[in-house]
From Swiss-Prot:
One of its GO terms (molecular function) is structural constituent of ribosome. Gene3D superfamilies: Ribosomal protein L22/L17 (3.90.470.10). It comes from Streptococcus uberis (strain ATCC BAA-854 / 0140J). This is Large ribosomal subunit protein uL22. SUPFAM superfamilies: Ribosomal protein L22. Belongs to the universal ribosomal protein uL22 family. GO terms for cellular component: cytosolic large ribosomal subunit. GO terms for biological process: translation. It comes from the Bacteria. The keyword Transmembrane does not apply. The gene is rplV.
């Protein structure tokens, strides 16, 4: 049987737009886990907080479930898919209204041994 060398964590229905989340994910993809955490700590973005929590969860999954060493882990795969959109309306002049889409994101972080 093949040995497991990767672990995954997901954050679902996060109240940040997928487009903004992808910008932060591009910063950490392919980096060592320690470097990725340092980058996220100093990124002034709402998405960075969520991604940092998800990354820490993936690291914990790797250590506890699969017995992998944190020092050997690399962020191998990250992606942000679109979650459900909350549709709202903003009242405008003359009794009309404009639609507002409050987008949500499903964030996935995969860490693997290098």
């Amino acid at each position: 049987m093949a040995e497991i060398t990767s672990a995954k964590a997901m954050a679902r229905t996060v109240r940040v737009s997928p487009r903004k989340t992808r910008l932060v994910l591009d910063l950490i993809r392919g980096k060592k886990v320690a470097d990725a955490i340092a980058i996220l700590k100093f990124t002034p973005n709402k998405a960075a907080r969520v991604i940092e929590k998800t990354l820490n969860s993936a690291i914990a999954n790797a250590e506890n479930n699969f017995g992998l060493e944190k020092a050997n882990l690399v962020v191998s795969e990250t992606f942000a898919n679109e979650g459900p959109t909350m549709k709202r309306f903003r009242p405008r002049a003359k009794g009309s209204a404009s639609p507002i889409n409050k987008r949500t994101t499903h964030v996935t972080v995969v860490v693997a041994e290098k």
